[in-house]
């Protein structure tokens, strides 16, 4: 039916019932080619998503072909550059709770992904600083404060404007030291109330609480 959109309207979802009725009532029970084409596109979106899910199930990760279909999307502030558009497909809320700051950008997401990949390599209490997807400081110590100080000592210049991540709970003492530099994003499994008050003093600073969900073992770039 979708292939015959020149003469046929296909309805792929219950959510389209009301818009379709409104359209038919407005145009005297007729539709334009442009409207039928749009409905056909929506139908193929549904069927291709279904077919991709079936293929990936039977392919079982063998990688004979890459087919990915994700319905949910989040528009980002911009893409890699300000004049470009950027979208995130998936459920970011399954990984993080954003409790403060501006919207996450495309470049923020790249750094966040690299940061999570890096910190997951460590079982000991660790603090890492990343800039442009690369670590510019990292330390494993017995306290978050000591780990932060030694990670920063690795390259205090490059840390400016970076992404910070730790696998430990950030307390007030650590937050007071961290707050002395400018950074874009900070990620931790939790924060003390006093620490949040300190780190939240900058309006645009992105503060993320990382949930227990793990990144997939297999990634395609």
Give a label for each model feature.
Residues 1-5, 11:
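Active-site cavity-forming subdomains of large catalytic enzyme subunits
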Residues 4-5, 16-191, 195-221:
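Active-site loops and adjacent core secondary-structure elements that bind or stabilize anionic groups
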Residues 10-11, 129:
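A structural signal for short, well-ordered beta-strand segments and their strand-loop junctions
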